[in-house]
Amino acid sequence: MNNDTNITTGGKERVAQAADLYQHAFRDDPVISYMLCGLDTQQRHDYLYEYFTRLNTAAALNAAIFEEADNWASASVILPPGKRIDNPWTLVPAGFFQVLWKLGFAGCNRMLREYEPAVTAMQRQELGDTTHFYYLFAIATREAARGRGLSSALIRKLQQRAADEDASVWLEATTVSSARLYAKLGFKSVGVVTLGEGVAAPDGSKEQGGTGVPVDCMVWRPGKEDHSE
């Protein structure tokens, strides 16, 4: 880990700050564009702060770890072992059903009946029935701060935490560039889930006959992949 990177850790008090960063960093994320298919580009951009506020709140209610680097130039949201963001007991207080309402029928179907089951199946195929793994729910860096290794520093800190507990780390890479970064940090691709085959382009936009949106499921295991500089 880069010892020059200042990283701080917190919890639910950081929901809004993380949402503010993510609304910009994920403006054109392919999976989010695909999920929010009922909104045009401007509507989607305008909605992202609320979207991430709801999701971050659901994560926080499940003991998520919020870490930031260099005064919120980069941030991650991490679910500890045994915790899930789709816990039904916390979705209601998080206001998640407002997200489902905004998604509309098609968006709900894509999130709940397409994305979640496919990723969960891949997860179980690779990790079995164990819940002893960290889930890197979200990580992003502000555009002006990219190229400084901030996301890498956050991930290395997570890897050290996981290694101390002999736990794996799971994530889903939604872009080629992010998958490349994770691979450099020792994550192994265990399979690609393709969303919207025949109806979506790789960037998440609508396209009849499109090849769909690829999501690279990846895992890191302590002692098997290097997380050093």
Locate each region found by the language model.
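Eukaryotic N-terminal low-complexity, Ser/Thr- and Lys/Arg-rich leader segments
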Residues: 1-6, 12, 223-229
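Conserved active-site alpha-helix within GNAT-family acetyltransferase domains
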Residues: 152, 164-166, 175-199
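Conserved GNAT acetyl-CoA-binding A-motif
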Residues: 132-134, 161-174
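A short helix-loop-beta-strand connector motif used in the catalytic cores of GNAT acetyltransferases and
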Residues: 46-67, 74, 131-132
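Helix-loop element at the rim of GNAT/NAT acetyltransferase active sites that forms part
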Residues: 20-42, 55
